[in-house]
C-alpha cells in the first residue's frame, strides 16, 4: 500500500511510524492481554502512558515547572468558551486580537460571559497582515489578551510573541504548536487542539501558569473548572484514552526526530519551497499575505478562477496529493505543512504546481 501526501488542515497527516505502531498495538497492548482502548484510565498501565505523554511534552516544549499541563476532551472551540469562565470575572474586560477566521470564533465563544473588546482587527485589510502591536488598543485591567498564533484559513502567523506588558497573554496554538521554538514564559496560557501537530482529533492540550488557576473566575460546574482538572491530573472524568495514547506516541516521535529545533528547520524548508513556487509563477498562483506574517503551516493560494481551482484539486488528488481544496470561507487552494508532512511532500507539490502551470498556464 502506498500512502499519499495528505495536505489536510485537520484532522491532519500523522507520522506513518506512529500509525504502524498503533496498528500493531491496537488488539493487544504492552503484554496486558487487552487493547489500550479497553483498559481503565485509572489503571497503573494507562497512568504510565499519561505520565509519559506529559513528561515528553514538557521536554519537547521546554515547559517550566510553574506551568500546569492539561489534556482535555474536545477541541479548541471548547477551550475558547472555558477561558472566560475560568480566568475572568462576570462582565470583566478581555482583549482579543483578530487576525483571521479563528480569532472571530474565539470572540464568539467568549461573548456570553465577559466584556469582549477587540484590541485590533486585520479584517479591514482582508486579513493579509497583522496590525502592529503599537496600534493595539489594550484595556489596562483586562483579564487577558487573546491571540490566534496561526490562522489556518487565511494563512497568517505571528512570527514574534507580542509584548502586552503585564497583562496575561493567552494564545491559540492549535495549528503551530511544536513547529518552532517557543518561550512559554511569555504567555499566561497556550492551548492547542491536537489534530494538526500533536495527534488525532478529540483531545486538546492546555498549558497554563499555575498562579492563574487561583483566579475565582465565574460560577461553573467542576467539569468546566481547570483547577479541578489539574488537581485530578486531567482525569476528573474519563478521558479519551486512545487519543491520549496516540498523542504520546506522536510527541515521542517528534523528540526522536530531533525536537522542535529540527522541525523548525524542516518547516522553514517546506514553506520556502511552496512560497517559492507561488512567487515564481508570474502570477499564475497568487498569495496575498504579507511576507512578514506568512504562515509556515498553512499556505493558501489562488489560481485564475474557480474552475481552474477545481481542476487543480482534482488533478492533484489523482497525482497522490490529497486535501488541497481551500476552506469554504475563502476558496482557492490550501497546502497544510504540519510537522508530520515530510519535505518530500512539499517537493511533490511543487513539482505538480510546475507541471500544472505548464499545461494550463
Swiss-Prot record:
<feature type="binding site">
    <location>
        <position position="152"/>
    </location>
    <ligand>
        <name>pyridoxal 5'-phosphate</name>
    </ligand>
</feature>
<feature type="binding site">
    <location>
        <begin position="237"/>
        <end position="238"/>
    </location>
    <ligand>
        <name>pyridoxal 5'-phosphate</name>
    </ligand>
</feature>
<dbReference type="GO" id="GO:0008615">
    <property type="term" value="P:pyridoxine biosynthetic process"/>
</dbReference>
<dbReference type="Pfam" id="PF00266">
    <property type="entry name" value="Aminotran_5"/>
</dbReference>
<dbReference type="GO" id="GO:0005737">
    <property type="term" value="C:cytoplasm"/>
</dbReference>
<feature type="binding site">
    <location>
        <position position="195"/>
    </location>
    <ligand>
        <name>pyridoxal 5'-phosphate</name>
    </ligand>
</feature>
<feature type="binding site">
    <location>
        <position position="42"/>
    </location>
    <ligand>
        <name>L-glutamate</name>
    </ligand>
</feature>
<dbReference type="GO" id="GO:0030170">
    <property type="term" value="F:pyridoxal phosphate binding"/>
</dbReference>
<protein>
    <recommendedName>
        <fullName>Phosphoserine aminotransferase</fullName>
        <ecNumber>2.6.1.52</ecNumber>
    </recommendedName>
</protein>
<keyword id="KW-0664">Pyridoxine biosynthesis</keyword>
<comment type="function">
    <text>Catalyzes the reversible conversion of 3-phosphohydroxypyruvate to phosphoserine and of 3-hydroxy-2-oxo-4-phosphonooxybutanoate to phosphohydroxythreonine.</text>
</comment>
<keyword id="KW-0808">Transferase</keyword>
<feature type="binding site">
    <location>
        <position position="172"/>
    </location>
    <ligand>
        <name>pyridoxal 5'-phosphate</name>
    </ligand>
</feature>
<dbReference type="InterPro" id="IPR020578">
    <property type="entry name" value="Aminotrans_V_PyrdxlP_BS"/>
</dbReference>
<dbReference type="InterPro" id="IPR015422">
    <property type="entry name" value="PyrdxlP-dep_Trfase_small"/>
</dbReference>
<dbReference type="InterPro" id="IPR015424">
    <property type="entry name" value="PyrdxlP-dep_Trfase"/>
</dbReference>
<keyword id="KW-0963">Cytoplasm</keyword>
<dbReference type="InterPro" id="IPR015421">
    <property type="entry name" value="PyrdxlP-dep_Trfase_major"/>
</dbReference>
<comment type="subunit">
    <text>Homodimer.</text>
</comment>
<comment type="pathway">
    <text>Cofactor biosynthesis; pyridoxine 5'-phosphate biosynthesis; pyridoxine 5'-phosphate from D-erythrose 4-phosphate: step 3/5.</text>
</comment>
<keyword id="KW-0032">Aminotransferase</keyword>
<feature type="modified residue" description="N6-(pyridoxal phosphate)lysine">
    <location>
        <position position="196"/>
    </location>
</feature>
<keyword id="KW-0718">Serine biosynthesis</keyword>
<comment type="similarity">
    <text>Belongs to the class-V pyridoxal-phosphate-dependent aminotransferase family. SerC subfamily.</text>
</comment>
<dbReference type="GO" id="GO:0004648">
    <property type="term" value="F:O-phospho-L-serine:2-oxoglutarate aminotransferase activity"/>
</dbReference>
<feature type="binding site">
    <location>
        <begin position="76"/>
        <end position="77"/>
    </location>
    <ligand>
        <name>pyridoxal 5'-phosphate</name>
    </ligand>
</feature>
<keyword id="KW-0028">Amino-acid biosynthesis</keyword>
<dbReference type="InterPro" id="IPR022278">
    <property type="entry name" value="Pser_aminoTfrase"/>
</dbReference>
<comment type="pathway">
    <text>Amino-acid biosynthesis; L-serine biosynthesis; L-serine from 3-phospho-D-glycerate: step 2/3.</text>
</comment>
<feature type="binding site">
    <location>
        <position position="102"/>
    </location>
    <ligand>
        <name>pyridoxal 5'-phosphate</name>
    </ligand>
</feature>
<keyword id="KW-0663">Pyridoxal phosphate</keyword>
<dbReference type="GO" id="GO:0006564">
    <property type="term" value="P:L-serine biosynthetic process"/>
</dbReference>
<dbReference type="InterPro" id="IPR000192">
    <property type="entry name" value="Aminotrans_V_dom"/>
</dbReference>
Amino acid at each position: 500500500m502506498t500512502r499519499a501526501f495528505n495536505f489536510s488542515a485537520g484532522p491532519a497527516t500523522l507520522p506513518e511510524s506512529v500509525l504502524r505502531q498503533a496498528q500493531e498495538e491496537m488488539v493487544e497492548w504492552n503484554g496486558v492481554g487487552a487493547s489500550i482502548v479497553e483498559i481503565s484510565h485509572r489503571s497503573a498501565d494507562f497512568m504510565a502512558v499519561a505520565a509519559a505523554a506529559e513528561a515528553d511534552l514538557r521536554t519537547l516544549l521546554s515547559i517550566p515547572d510553574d506551568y500546569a499541563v492539561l489534556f482535555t476532551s474536545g477541541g479548541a472551540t471548547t477551550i475558547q468558551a472555558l477561558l472566560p469562565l475560568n480566568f475572568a470575572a462576570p462582565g470583566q474586560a478581555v482583549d482579543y486580537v483578530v487576525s483571521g477566521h479563528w480569532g472571530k470564533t474565539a470572540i464568539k465563544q467568549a461573548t456570553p460571559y465577559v466584556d469582549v473588546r477587540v484590541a485590533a482587527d486585520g479584517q479591514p485589510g482582508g486579513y493579509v497582515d497583522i496590525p502592529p502591536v503599537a496600534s493595539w488598543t489594550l484595556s489596562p485591567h483586562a483579564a487577558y489578551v487573546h491571540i490566534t498564533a496561526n490562522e489556518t484559513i487565511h494563512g497568517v502567523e505571528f512570527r514574534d510573541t507580542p509584548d502586552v506588558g503585564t497583562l496575561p497573554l493567552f494564545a491559540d496554538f492549535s495549528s503551530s504548536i511544536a513547529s518552532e521554538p517557543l518561550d512559554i514564559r511569555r504567555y499566561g496560557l497556550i492551548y492547542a487542539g491536537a489534530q494538526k501537530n500533536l495527534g488525532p482529533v478529540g483531545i486538546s492540550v492546555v498549558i497554563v501558569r499555575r498562579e492563574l488557576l487561583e483566579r475565582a473566575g465565574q460560577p461553573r460546574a467542576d467539569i468546566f473548572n481547570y483547577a479541578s482538572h489539574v488537581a485530578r491530573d486531567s482525569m476528573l472524568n474519563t478521558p479519551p484514552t486512545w487519543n491520549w495514547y496516540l498523542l504520546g506516541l506522536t510527541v515521542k516521535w517528534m523528540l526522536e526526530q530531533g525536537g522542535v529545533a529540527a522541525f523548525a528547520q524542516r518547516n522553514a524548508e517546506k514553506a520556502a519551497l511552496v512560497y517559492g513556487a507561488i512567487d515564481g509563477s508570474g502570477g499564475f498562483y497568487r498569495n496575498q499575505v504579507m511576507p512578514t506574517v506568512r504562515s509556515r503551516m498553512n499556505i493558501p493560494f489562488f489560481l485564475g478562477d474557480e474552475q481552474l481551482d477545481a481542476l487543480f484539486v482534482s488533478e492533484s488528488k489523482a497525482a497522490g496529493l490529497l486535501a488541497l481544496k481551500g476552506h469554504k470561507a475563502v476558496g482557492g487552494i490550501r497546502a497544510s505543512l504540519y510537522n508530520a508532512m515530510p519535505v518530500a511532500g512539499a517537493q511533490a507539490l511543487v513539482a505538480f504546481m510546475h507541471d500544472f502551470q505548464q499545461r494550463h498556464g
